């Protein structure tokens, strides 16, 4: 992640045909656009899985509009480009992640109605908010006066990451006193999704207010967020899928005191806000200025263990039958003991679900034994954070010279601070953990400085909630 400071000045002319049809096409988009977020956009960690269908379905191009609506569940990509080649703006301010180059759709998850007003463009198309990147761009309009007056309640169910979703949106429209207010709430939930061991718990909110002072000036403010907690599924090997007799096998969870517990849990919350000033200087000249803020808090948990502890992952290669001997190698002749062990491990994998999943109780027992001997905690659960603090500013001046010519001048300033660290989430019943590289200890011993994660605070004792391992900022 790095700080990006960009100043963009764009001067271009609109052809008579584009200019004459601009207003009509904008109205057609608002009336007929079908804007669809895929499940991958709202829920996946891997931003590379995000598709471009979010913007193409709001585009007035016949081809893009149709494929965006019809193929969005299939993660349609314009010309095969990944999502880092597409830009997403809110009130004219770029909100793409500086590190990945992609827009985080999780920040507006569950806010379908609040993000319905938008303008989409294809590659290098003429527009009033940005250069057209090769993957296209979308500008979401969150000004309160742009929402139709009224209320809407929707309930839906599915059998994917979550099973129930509720959304409520209310808008006053533009009142006689020049004020407009819009609010939206959403909730998505699943005790367990279609993948065993996963769960979903997400709340979302949106609040917007706007004051129209007169025909020339208006000020608007909007804030939104979607705090989310969800259990992840994990990829495994074809051998594990075969033994589990399911390609939905998920090695990330296990039983703890008879209850399912997922080791890979995502906690994400990206509270954001944007303020906009619209100044219609006259009929020919317009100035739109916006300033945005985003604080991204994203953490994903994972199991950790010392170099002297057995690997707790159930699908670790040494726990699979293939580690005993290679059944596909005809030159391999197993001994009777190897064959018996192979059959025994295969049978356990096929018949015992506990064999295929994480053994939480065993990890707690191992740590309790280490406590009794005054030794280091063997197993723990860490949370890896990739947080951001971002400020964005945009000012766009549009001048229509005559019926055939116009130009746009824009200024954009973006700055981001990235905060990367991990913290101790759960010691799993352990008492003692020292901030050193446990695998380096095996090679260099406890007396070597090489094992220290923090040379300024050597051998620092770590408790739950403390940062350890690494902690750095990138500006």
Task: Name each region found by the language model.
Residues 148-171, 413-475:
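Outer-membrane beta-barrel transmembrane domain signature of Gram-negative proteins
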Residues 55, 64, 93-124, 141-143, ...:
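Short acidic/polar hinge/loop motifs at secondary-structure boundaries
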Residues 149-153, 179-183, 219-221, 287-291, ...:
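Transmembrane beta-strands of outer-membrane beta-barrel proteins
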Residues 157-190, 194-233, 265, 271-281:
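Transmembrane beta-barrel wall of Gram-negative outer-membrane proteins
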Residues 74, 134-136, 164-168, 203-207, ...:
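Hydrophobic, lipid-facing positions within transmembrane beta-strands of outer-membrane proteins
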Residues 218-276, 299-382, 445-460:
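Acidic/polar loop-and-plug regions of large Gram-negative outer-membrane beta-barrel proteins
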Residues 53-94, 123:
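Extracytoplasmic beta-strand/coil segments of soluble accessory domains associated
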Residues 81, 259-302, 376-414, 419-420, ...:
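Outer-membrane beta-barrel transmembrane strands
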């Amino acid at each position: 992640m790095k700080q990006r400071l960009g100043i963009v000045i764009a001067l271009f002319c609109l052809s008579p045909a584009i200019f004459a049809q601009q207003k009509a096409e904008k109205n057609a988009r608002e009336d007929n656009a079908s804007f669809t977020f895929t499940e991958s956009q709202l829920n996946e960690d891997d931003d590379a899985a995000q598709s471009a269908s979010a913007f193409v379905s709001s585009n007035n191009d016949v081809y893009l509009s149709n494929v965006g609506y019809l193929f969005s569940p299939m993660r349609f990509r314009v010309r095969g480009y990944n999502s880092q080649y597409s830009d997403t703006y809110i009130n004219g301010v770029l909100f793409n992640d500086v590190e990945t180059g992609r827009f985080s759709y999780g920040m507006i998850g569950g806010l379908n109605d609040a993000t319905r007003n938008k303008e989409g463009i294809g590659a290098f198309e003429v527009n009033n908010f940005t250069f057209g990147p090769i993957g296209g761009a979308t500008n979401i309009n969150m000004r309160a006066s742009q929402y139709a007056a009224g209320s809407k309640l929707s309930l839906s169910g599915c059998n994917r990451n979550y099973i129930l979703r509720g959304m409520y949106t209310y808008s006053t429209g533009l009142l006689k006193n020049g004020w407009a207010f819009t609010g939206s709430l959403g909730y998505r939930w699943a005790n367990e999704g279609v993948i065993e061991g996963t769960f979903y718990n997400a709340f979302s909110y949106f609040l917007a207010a706007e004051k129209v002072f007169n025909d020339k000036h208006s000020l608007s403010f909007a804030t939104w967020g979607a705090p989310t907690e969800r259990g992840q599924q994990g990829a495994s090997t074809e051998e594990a899928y075969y033994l589990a007799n399911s390609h939905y096998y998920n090695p990330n969870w296990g039983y703890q005191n008879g209850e399912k517990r997922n080791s890979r849990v995502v906690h994400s919350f990206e509270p954001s806000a944007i303020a906009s000033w619209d100044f219609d200087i006259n009929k020919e000249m317009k100035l739109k200025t916006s300033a945005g803020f985003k604080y991204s808090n994203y953490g994903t948990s994972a199991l950790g263990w010392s170099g002297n502890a057995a690997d707790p992952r159930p699908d670790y290669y040494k726990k699979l039958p293939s580690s005993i001997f290679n059944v596909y190698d005809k030159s391999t002749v197993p001994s009777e003991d190897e064959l018996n062990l192979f059959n025994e491990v295969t049978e356990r994998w096929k018949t015992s679900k506990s064999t295929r999943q994480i053994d939480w109780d065993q990890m707690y027992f191992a740590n309790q034994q280490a406590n009794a001997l005054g030794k280091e905690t063997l197993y723990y659960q860490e949370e890896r954070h990739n947080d951001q603090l971002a400020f964005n500013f945009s000012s766009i001046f549009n001048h229509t010279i005559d019926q055939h010519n116009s130009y746009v001048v824009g200024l954009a300033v973006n700055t981001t601070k990235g905060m990367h660290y991990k913290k101790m989430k759960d010691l799993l019943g352990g008492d003692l953990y020292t901030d050193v590289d446990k695998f380096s200890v095996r090679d260099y011993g406890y007396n070597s400085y090489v094992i220290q994660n923090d040379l300024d605070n050597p051998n620092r004792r770590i408790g739950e909630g403390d940062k350890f391992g690494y902690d750095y900022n990138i500006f």
